[in-house]
């Protein structure tokens, strides 16, 4: 049985984003391994994870809450990437 969240384009895009972020963080300085690298990866992983968790819930309000959390994680990730760019 395949989980329905795997059929969501937004989940697939989130998984692609995680892969990209993992590749990107390998180029960060070693002294950022437990700082920026960890934060970027955690924020990225949170996006598809919350989409998957929310889609498996049986309540639309709970699903919307998880989507809201995923959006927050996306904003967090954007901020970390902007900081890393500077």
Predicted features, each with a name:
Residues 1-86:
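Amphipathic alpha-helical assembly/interaction segments
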């Amino acid at each position: 049985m395949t989980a329905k969240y795997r059929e969501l384009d937004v989940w697939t895009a989130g998984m692609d984003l995680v892969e990209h972020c993992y590749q990107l963080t390998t180029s960060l300085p070693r002294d950022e391994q437990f700082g920026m690298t960890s934060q970027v990866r955690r924020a990225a992983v949170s996006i598809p994870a919350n989409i998957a968790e929310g889609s498996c819930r049986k309540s639309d309000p709970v699903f919307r809450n998880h989507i809201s959390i995923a959006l927050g994680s996306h904003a967090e990730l954007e901020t970390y990437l902007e900081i890393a760019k500077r």
